[in-house]
């Protein structure tokens, strides 16, 4: 098995990438670095769920740096500009994951962000490719989005905590607005 450092945003989004990467001959080590997740209780809840799942699955977990001040200074000011905000957020988190991968002697690096249909897939991959190359790492980029329904099913079956927004306060507002819009559309369709 080839060791791979896999940045993880949460336990549910890790399920299918870990399974599929193992089938390809990789042995993922999970790397948690998510200073974007707010509020602090939400950050703790997601990390605790990931810790539990990794322990149950005998998966190594590295808890890396959490530079919240840097996130607030470099990402938060982009606020409502989702494409720029997400690109900056991916860059901050994946730069830390690549730093850890290089320091720990990994050749391969990837991210579970590629499982969610709500992420900016191409942007995330562009950022990962650039940062991995700068550190002499090989990015492992896979489109896990077709497996999102299975990840959802499995996470519910396992009783995992499932969040309903990406992590930052801006995504929480955007997700709430999307849910309200969908609810309104369903009500209108029933009339």
Roles of regions detected by a PLM:
Residues 1-191:
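Nucleotide-activated chemistry modules centered on ATP-dependent adenylation/adenylyltransferase
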């Amino acid at each position: 098995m080839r060791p791979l450092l896999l940045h993880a945003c949460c336990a549910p989004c890790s399920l299918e990438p870990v399974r599929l990467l193992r089938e390809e001959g990789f042995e993922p080590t999970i790397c948690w670095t998510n200073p974007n997740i707010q509020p602090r209780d939400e950050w703790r809840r997601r990390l605790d769920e990931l810790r539990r799942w990794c322990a149950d699955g005998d998966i190594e977990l590295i808890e890396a740096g959490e530079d919240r001040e840097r996130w607030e200074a470099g990402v938060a000011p982009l606020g409502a500009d989702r494409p720029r905000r997400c690109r900056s957020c991916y860059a901050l988190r994946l730069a830390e994951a690549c730093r850890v991968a290089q320091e720990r002697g990994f050749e391969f690096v990837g991210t579970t962000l590629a499982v969610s249909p709500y992420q900016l897939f191409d942007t995330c991959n562009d950022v990962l490719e650039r940062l991995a190359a700068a550190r002499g790492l090989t990015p492992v980029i896979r489109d896990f989005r077709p497996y999102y329904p299975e990840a959802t099913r499995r996470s519910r079956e396992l009783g995992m905590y499932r969040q309903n927004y990406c992590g930052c306060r801006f995504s929480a507002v955007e997700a709430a607005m999307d849910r309200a819009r969908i609810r309104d559309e369903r009500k209108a369709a029933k009339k």
